């Protein structure tokens, strides 16, 4: 089905995503399956073994036929969009390593998502975002800054304004961060090793000297990074990878709460982590699946005991 050169390039691409881009296993498996499906379709479409010539010659008709096939195979919109992202990623890799250029592939727009999507992102969408956010930045320190900031927001449920106000003084404790939130209300939030390590790496690469009480996240001119600047990076990310329109820095705070709830955390704990005054705010803030609510109801209602 595939000639030897294509097989070798796929192996190199997989190693690149794993070792250099540090993609999660979940994304690696998904992307590999998406590319496999695409190449199998190309083999069927051309009735011939897939070669570099066929890869280079992929046109609008082939791409649209493949996307239509995915839809007929009952792939959901997010999976179709992810598949297109995987193919674009592979072609981007081929541009760098094999000098193969195909502008048609990059011109294909991802399928639009429903306007009624909840504000939280799915775990898959979060994984894609964390894996790809480093691709947006004109220098290495900005790339690692973007990832460190996004991981911190999602790992700790911070508001973008809170994350951008963090200084070296906040980072002295290896297990907790003290945050001054809305209404000058201080809260203590655990932070994960992955966030600590990324911030440490970012500070090592940061080309500007900082005082201990200065915010650590800086713009390219060395000034304090502003929310609109970071959100512009996220806009590039969601457009290229077909992620939901509501994706923003704040949607990762929503996702933090939603995913904790779906994995068994109680609302009171989430309320404390988010810094909400009332529990009702937390309830409306999180995305709770019907299945989760149904399970909680059946398990907890006294009449069922």
Swiss-Prot record:
Residues 4-95 form the Core-binding (CB) domain. The active site is at residues 159, 182, 250, 253, 276, 285. GO terms for molecular function: DNA binding; tyrosine-based site-specific recombinase activity. It is found in: Cytoplasm. One of its GO terms (cellular component) is cytoplasm. Residues 116-298 form the Tyr recombinase domain. Keywords: Cell cycle, Cell division, Chromosome partition, Cytoplasm, DNA integration, DNA recombination, DNA-binding. The keyword Cytoplasm applies. InterPro entries: CB (IPR044068), DNA_brk_join_enz (IPR011010), Integrase-like_cat_sf (IPR013762), Integrase_catalytic (IPR002104), Integrase_recombinase_N (IPR010998), Integrase_SAM-like_N (IPR004107), Tyrosine_recombinase_XerC/XerD (IPR023009), Tyrosine_recombinase_XerCD (IPR050090). Pfam families: Phage_int_SAM_1, Phage_integrase. It comes from the Bacteria. GO terms for biological process: cell division; chromosome segregation; DNA transposition. Site-specific tyrosine recombinase, which acts by catalyzing the cutting and rejoining of the recombining DNA molecules. The XerC-XerD complex is essential to convert dimers of the bacterial chromosome into monomers to permit their segregation at cell division. It also contributes to the segregational stability of plasmids. Forms a cyclic heterotetrameric complex composed of two molecules of XerC and two molecules of XerD. Belongs to the 'phage' integrase family. XerC subfamily. This is Tyrosine recombinase XerC. It comes from Rickettsia bellii (strain OSU 85-389).
């Amino acid at each position: 089905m595939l000639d030897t050169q294509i097989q070798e390039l796929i192996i190199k691409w997989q190693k690149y995503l794993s070792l250099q881009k540090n993609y999660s296993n979940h994304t690696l498996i998904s992307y590999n399956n998406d590319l496999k499906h695409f190449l199998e379709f190309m083999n069927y479409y051309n009735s011939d073994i897939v070669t570099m010539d066929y890869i280079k010659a992929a046109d609008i008709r082939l791409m649209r036929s493949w996307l239509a096939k995915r839809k007929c195979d009952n792939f959901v919109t997010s999976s179709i969009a992810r598949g297109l992202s995987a193919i674009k990623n592979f072609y981007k890799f081929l541009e760098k390593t094999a000098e193969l250029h195909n502008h048609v592939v990059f011109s294909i727009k991802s399928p639009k998502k429903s306007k009624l999507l909840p504000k939280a992102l799915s775990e898959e969408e979060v994984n894609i975002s964390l894996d790809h956010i480093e691709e947006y930045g004109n220098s290495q320190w900005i790339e690692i800054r973007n990832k460190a900031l996004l991981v911190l927001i999602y790992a700790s449920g911070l508001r973008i304004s809170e994350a951008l106000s963090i200084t070296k003084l906040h980072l002295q404790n290896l297990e907790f961060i003290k945050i001054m939130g809305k209404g000058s209300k201080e809260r203590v939030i655990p932070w994960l090793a992955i966030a600590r390590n990324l911030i440490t790496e970012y500070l090592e690469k940061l080309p500007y000297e900082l005082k201990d009480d200065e915010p650590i996240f800086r713009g390219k001119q060395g000034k304090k990074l502003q929310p609109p600047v970071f959100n512009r990076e996220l806009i590039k990310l969601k457009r290229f990878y077909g992620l939901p329109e509501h994706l923003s820095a704040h949607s990762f705070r929503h996702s933090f709460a939603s995913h904790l709830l779906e994995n068994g955390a109680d609302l009171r704990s989430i309320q404390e982590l988010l810094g909400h005054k009332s529990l009702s705010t937390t309830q409306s803030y999180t995305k709770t699946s019907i299945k989760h609510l149904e399970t909680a109801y059946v398990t907890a209602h006294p009449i069922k005991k």
